[in-house]
């Protein structure tokens, strides 16, 4: 198989970024007749797609680092989830052309420290900028969707040119729009206008609040089995609320209510969410503050989904139950089944017993991870729908413990296929 690709680049920097003519190099090499020929070529059939792409496309030193630490993981997850091979290559080609330049300089241990580069990523405790995940549905097998979140950065991040690291994410969104004519920018542009800050104001706020290290924006992708790539804009509320002198909760309400075309249609669900928030009992830590929003980057309409993320103060099962039921407002059969599943999860994974529902989980590792919820809002819905997240490693003594407990959980709920393959998949992804 002969690939027609550009010359390799220099040792440093993202030279593809400077030349827009090269931005679709992978999608040209791995689509149409070229991809059909590749799939028929026995000489590459035994090699994983990430290895094939790595061997034939140009990679500078920075590209190589990020491909090996992010692209390879994405590829391994697609292999484990059984994505069709053609879709696997098309997804990696999109990742190479559109996403790979968004990671910026190779991280250094001195990032964010005196004398080092000013920006250190915040998405994970160790400074990682990439959070991949599998969305397991129904049986944990063929419905699995590959997803990931990214905290973009570049040489401007944290400097006077971009104090709050807003520009690298914007560049990524523009590449997404250039790559896909159906990538609708209406909600992104609205979010940018409502929550992002100009350079002068960003510098002023950074000086006024030097101890605040909140991010401004993440971006996320769902790579669906249909071939659709769903982008998600994740703006944070901290800096804009400081600028306006209002609470993050009030800011979230304003932004959602003002969404083009459908903002007023979230009125009932926002009222129910507010009732849930203000009713948070003291023994659960009281009312938490929203952290961020999440917009699906789609044309605003009746199916437009918006999420508000909150982090409760407590990690006990009863705290989780309170959030999951919106303080008792959600009491239908599906919610009851979800509560039972959460109870099983806490029992199997965290070993809580009868009478320990108010006990806080034991923390084995420091860091800001913990329990997180989002409330998903849809137009005309009476109530938002909560989703539960937990940083399991924080509450487990070792990786082996995580593997054993989650395997037991999959087996308990009848996901035998996931239980049988989980330990192997974990090791293969490392």
Please give the residue ranges for each predicted region.
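Fungal eukaryote-biased detector of long internal structured cores
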Residues: 108-304, 312
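Short Lys/Arg-enriched alpha/beta "domain-start" segment
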Residues: 61-107
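Intrinsically disordered, low-complexity regions enriched in Ser/Pro/Gly/Gln/His and often acidic
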Residues: 59-60, 96, 112, 266, ...
